[in-house]
Amino acid sequence: MSLGSELFRDVAIVFSQEEWQWLAPAQRDLYRDVMLETYSNLVSLGLAVSKPDVISFLEQGKEPWMVERVVSGGLCPVLESRYDTKELFPKQHVYEVESPQWEIMESLTSYGLECSSFQDDWECRNQFDRQQGNPDRHFHQMIIRHEEMPTFDQHASLTFYQKIHTREKPFGYNKCRKDFWQKELLINHQGIYTNEKPYKCKECGKAFKYGSRLIQHENIHSGKKPYECKECGKAFNSGSNFIQHQRVHTGEKPYECKDCEKAFSRSSQLIEHQRTHTGEKPYQCKECGKAFNRISHLKVHYRIHTGEKPYACKECGKTFSHRSQLIQHQTVHTGRKLYECKECGKAFNQGSTLIRHQRIHTGEKPYECKVCGKAFRVSSQLKQHQRIHTGEKPYQCKVCGRAFKRVSHLTVHYRIHTGEKPYECKECGKAFSHCSQLIHHQVIHTEKKPYEYKECEKTLSHDSTTVQPQRMHNRETHVNIINVEKPSISSYPLLIIREFMLASNHMNGSNGESPLA
């Protein structure tokens, strides 16, 4: 057996008929990709590999045990009786071996490996001759499953064919009581139950369960990209990535969601999408326990805890934890905005941002709270809102342990410990930790007192101080003021004012919990 054929047999992933029936369509497609990729890798490495029947089947889109060529003249009576009584699996098929493998079958005949009735029942042998109509071109019939299918080679082990015809399966696995013809098939099957990874990369030490994965991984170190797209010239280091890329040009989306009929070009995209229906979040942060439906989201989230910022701007050196943040920042240097709103002309550097912006014009609010029915334009707003019902506070201060519902609130709070004051007054140079504090300070320079209390017409510089004079006139707890002259500060978002309230409560030693926490 050639080195290539032996390696393919060693690394090929094999499923029995029973296992195949349990696989989902996406998993079957993944199996096809891996098997075809394994064979392509061996060929690209210059190893002589005679194409196995299973590869031919997969290339034609057939199931691994699809009949390649049905015997027209019937079966040997012994095999036919086994087939009719369903002693064998119903989807097992007959394979005929003829020239140029005739020399092999000739040697098998000399060892008495033909149908067992051939030794004593010459009528059975004559029936074979009559089937083919040519006594000089004998065919040897075997009923075998995909996992038992041999690659006929003049140097193949005679014992292997004996085991096929006698249906002997000497390699058993105690965990599932399954038996196999070959030791390699047993090893592959054991990989389903164990985490053993026998194939190790010599460059970086990374280990893999299957040899085909190692071959694909080694292309990363060598820089080899043997799969090139004829449409655009883009090259890939794995056959599966190449196949997925081709769907960009063809528009093919073979993976469809049964719940909403949305289609995808990759099986992994469908699996991730289905979690939006099931609510499954299998990836959990070890630091704070927050769970995600995609591992990429977990990796990005984890940078909050590690402080990692892997994306650096080449222009100014500023670093970011998200790639999208870097792209957005780069527009400061380029001034380029790719996505423009047709309604108002506002431009954005990300398509997703434009989509969210357009909902302002359409009024669309696709994200609805299941508890109270409130709807939101952006999914992140819904997540923040849901914490009102759940009481979840995923963002915790490492210094004092205080927890917050929003990461922006944690960022503002953390300045109490660091002493950071990023907001500076241009008039006097005084610095503040909160933007809202700077806004209130600037009133001193403008000498504006825009808030008037209607009972005594006393004017104040900001509305929080109206509470005290109000209590002089009545016992009501509600603030009753008239905004006489709205300064520019009214344009600042409510969040800034709420941040100031949070800081004020903390600095005043309030024991009550802030509504923001």
UniProtKB/Swiss-Prot annotation:
It comes from the Eukaryota. GO terms for cellular component: nucleus. It is found in: Nucleus. GO terms for molecular function: DNA-binding transcription factor activity, RNA polymerase II-specific; RNA polymerase II transcription regulatory region sequence-specific DNA binding; zinc ion binding. InterPro entries: KRAB, KRAB_dom_sf, Znf_C2H2_sf, Znf_C2H2_type. Changing residue 345 to E: Found in a patient with mild intellectual disability and eye movement disorder; uncertain significance. A zinc finger (C2H2-type) spans 171-193, 199-221, 227-249, 255-277, 283-305, 311-333, 339-361, 367-389, 395-417, 423-445. May be involved in transcriptional regulation. This is Zinc finger protein 582. The gene is ZNF582.
